[in-house]
Structures are given as structure tokens and as C-alpha cells.
Amino acid sequence: MKKFTTLLATAAVLVGFASCTKKEKETGKTLNIAVSAEIKGMDPIYANDRYSSNEVGRVYEGLLEYHYLKRPYTLVPNLAESMPSVSEDGLTYTFKIRQGVLFHDSEAFPNGKGRELVAEDFVYSIKRLADPKLQGLGWWLLDGKIKGLNEWREKYADLDKVDYDEVVEGLKATGKYTLEFKLTKPFPQFLYSLAMPFTFATAREVVEKYGKEFLNHPVGTGPFVLPVFKQTKKVVYTKNPNFRKKLYPTEASDEFKAAGFLEDAGKQLPLVDKVVVSVIIESQPRWLNFLKGNVDYIGIPKDNFDSAVTPERELSKEYKDKGISLMITPSLDVTYTAFNHDLKLFQNPDLRRAMSLAYDVKKSNELFYNNTSLPAQSVVPPGIAGNIPNYVSPYRGPNIEEAKKLLAKAGYPEGKGLPEITYDCPSGTVSRQIGDYMKQQMAQIGVRIKVVTNPWPELQKKITKRQVMLYGIAWGADYPDAENFLQLLYGPNKAPGANGSGYDNPEFNKLFKTASVMQDSPERTALYEKMNRIAAEQAPWIYGVHRQNFTLRHSFLKNYMSTDFETGQAQYLNIDTELKAKVTKKL
């Protein structure tokens, strides 16, 4: 999932050593959020999708985070006291851990009271990510990057028990509050990995107490507390009464200053007492709940777009009169349909190209995205170095005549001899419609598709275990670098890593490996562009679109903006309770 900047950025998010007191009065402020997929659990090492990442980010924290009000996106300290000191050779990173930070209260601790966070907690948490028995879904992020960590992982691959106390050369707590990383090579994106949920701090006592049930007993250091997670349609978080002193930013980029985002400057976080997350899979019930004031913000469903947004891309008067605001922001993402390259069938590039040419992405943009998205020519979205402006993929459909020729060249004239292909997608009306559209498009050239819908956690599991043939999905940036998109096609990242399709091209892999250790430069961008062209010409996916976010928010919701990095956002949001009472009376 998402973006980056300089190593020595300074934080305008003010963080001190004191914590909130339990005597602090509740304000009655509740943030109401609706999500469109089931939440699979609350274990950071499995938070590989937008939904679980956002939930994990309410409870857990990492060394670094993105400054909430600065663009370009800028890394700043979070549980780290400051940005790290970095050796001249770019291999050793030394962090000072913020003192006085407490884990949430839990039965796993003596007397049920949360203990202080120390550097060793990060050593343990990152070893969990590397643990071969656990198969953490974010291992691709650190694979081959920390000295001795791969060897530690390989040593225990065939043993019954993993020794977390064994010292790893490149991952050490050199003092109670001092954490040291030694890298195998310089990796420019390394710091971004420390702002991702995969590397967030967990307490060993809690993991060992709950074992396999740990994902249902989240205990972090974050702004909100959730004693027990249950697979229900509603999850309720409460303000962490022992949260450290962390204040709303006092600095912002000009666009946010002008929009009034500094009204809460200097206030203690979080600004609300509760966060209620409702799982509402279908778009129309989500929409109706938003209109009733039961949900504070929402992406506009496709079926309601024309009533909410004018042809000039402005909010219609009906909604303006209700105090609703419209935000339009480009998203660093790509939607796509992936082939399972483990199957011999899809190792045939002409079959992949034929299916790509049969797919009318322009029409799908009209049908499912209200013609607001940009058809994707390859994997890297606009706004990131490595995207090639004005580039047109040679296999961007629709071109039915050429698709039929390539299908015949692949050995399946008019689809003869080709087995029925299963297309897996998430549950929900729109996802099903997209699946049916795929079926109809492929039928034009004689390719038979069977659509199978899955609850989101089940689809994730099937992709991870490579139990799919063809599947529809989207990827949102973890950080703002083309490497984060190109790694989706890097062979060594095959599932359970981020490369769910299992695409493995030696030339692409070689270029990726070279670029991954290069600093930002024209030379690195040239390699990114070369990989982007390979990704278009080899058609490892059927490319969809780069989306644009059209988000509505109620006037009583403060400090909200659509962002590529939502993890931790809830702590900055505020509710004007008096205004909410007035507004909801009229809804």
C-alpha cells in the first residue's frame, strides 16, 4: 500500500513524555467510519491490505509515521525520539526510542498494567515478521535487507521451535532505548518500511499469552484501545487513557493552512473518545447511513455519483445545502486483474496479451468509476518517477480482431481447447458487476469465465496460497516510490509475498534488484521506466485504472482529508458535537 522524503526530516507533530490522565473528561465525540470489507484480524504482520492496515493503525504504532499535514509526504518520528543517525556508508541506522511510552493494559502484564515500551520490543516484532512458522505477509519488505535476518529465518525453517533470543547481527537493542539496524546494502526505501504496520511494536508477553488468538487481542501503544477483537459488523475503539503526550501538528503545507486544518494545533491527541467502525459491504446501505449522519465520510458509490456531482465536477446543491463537502484527490493506486503464473496456461504471453486486448478499460471506467479514473497503461501510477507520461501499452484494449489473432497464436483459435477460467473477486454488488463485465468481455474472443465472489479475508487467503486462476484486485501505495508498485511483479516476492500473481521474469528481476539499492536519480528513474515497459509488453496482468477519490464529508467532521496513507489518521480527526446535533436533526 503507500509514499517518501529525506532522512532527517523534523517532526511538527509535537510529542512529549507525559501521558493523558485518566481523570481527563470525555467529550462525547465519536468518529463513525464505514468499511466495505470484513476485517480479518489485528496482527500487524498480516496487515497487508488497506482494511486491516487501518484497523491495526488505531491500536499499534511504529518508529516512524507520515506528517499528517505536509505534502510531499514526509516521514517524521513516532515511537522514535528523533530521526535515526545513519552511518556514512548508509548501512547502519541507530534509533533512540521514546521513553515513557506504555503498552495498553492487558492481562498479559503483571497486575494487568501495561509496561513501558523498550527497544527490544522492536527486535522481537521484526523477528516475528521474519519467523518462517508465522509466514508474515510483509516479509517481502525486509527480505535480504537486514544482516543475519535471512539466515536466522532459514535456520528455523525446518525446526520445531524458533529461538527469538538468538542474536541477529543486523537487529539489536544496544541499550534499553537504543535500536540498531545494520543493512546488507544501502536500501533507500528502508525508512518507509518502519512506518508500515508490518513493523509496528508488539509485546512478547501478549503474543505468548494468547498464541494463535493474538490477532483477536490487540495490545499496542496507540491512541485507541480495543480489548478484544471479534469478527462482527461493528468494532468500537475507545481513547487510550494512558496515551503519551502527542499533540496535533502546529505546522502544515499551505493548502492545509488555507483550508483551516490548524484549528486544533497543539491539542492533545486523539481528539475523539471513540471510533466506531461499521462493516457495511454493500454500497447503498453505506450511502444511506452517510445521508442519515451515521457515517462521517464516504467515497461516492458509482450509482449515486451523478446525483451528487455535477458535470463540472462540483457538489450538487442538494448536498451543499446539507453542509456536505466534496473532496477530489488522485490516488496512488492501480486496479488490475492478475493471472496466476504458477499455472502453465498463463505462462503463455500470447494468451495474456489476447485477454488484455479483449478488455475495454475505457468502457469499464464509464461503468464502474463514472469516467473519473485514468486507464492504466502499466503498473506505476502518475505522480511517481517511473511512470512514463503519454506512454500507450501495445496491449491496451479493446482490439478484438488483434486479440483473436493472438488467441489463435497462443494455440486456442476462437477459444477452442481452452478450459473455463475462474475469476475470483471480493463479495459485493459492484465487485460482482465487474466480474460479470470481465466474463462478457472475454466471451467476445471465445474465452469462458466463471465468476466466484469471496469475503475479503477469504480472497486474500486464496491469493496467498495461490489457489486462484484469475483475480481482480487493487494496490494502493505503501510509500511514494515506483519500487513499491514494481515489487508486485518481482519474482522473489511471490505469494505469500506481495507478488500474488507469481510473475517471474529474469530480466525484470535483474533490473529491479539493481534499482532497489540506488538513490533517487535519473539513472534509477530510467530503470523504473524500463521495468514499466516490460510490465506492459509482457502483460502479466490485465491493467485497469488509476483511480481518483471523490469523497464526501459532513460539516461536523474536522481535519479530514483523503490521503494515500490512512494508518493512524483517526487520532487527528475531530467532531463538532454541537454542529453535529444541528445537522443530523435536518437529515
Regions flagged by a language model, labelled:
Residues 68-70, 150-178, 182-276, 284-285, ...:
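Gly/Pro-rich hinge or "lid" segments in bacterial periplasmic/extracellular proteins
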Residues 224, 346, 374-410, 427-433:
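Structural transition elements
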Residues 35-88, 219:
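N-terminal lobe/hinge region of extracytoplasmic solute-binding protein
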Residues 227-238, 263-264, 276-342, 366:
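Extracellular/periplasmic solute-recognition and catalytic clefts
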Residues 81-141, 180, 286-289, 345-347:
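Aromatic- and charge-enriched surface segment that lines or borders ligand/interaction sites
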Residues 37-55, 79, 107-111, 137-138, ...:
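A structural "hinge/loop" feature
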Residues 16-19:
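C-terminal motif of bacterial Sec signal peptides marking the signal peptidase cleavage site
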Residues 26, 185-188, 218-219, 230-235, ...:
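Detector for C-terminal structural segments
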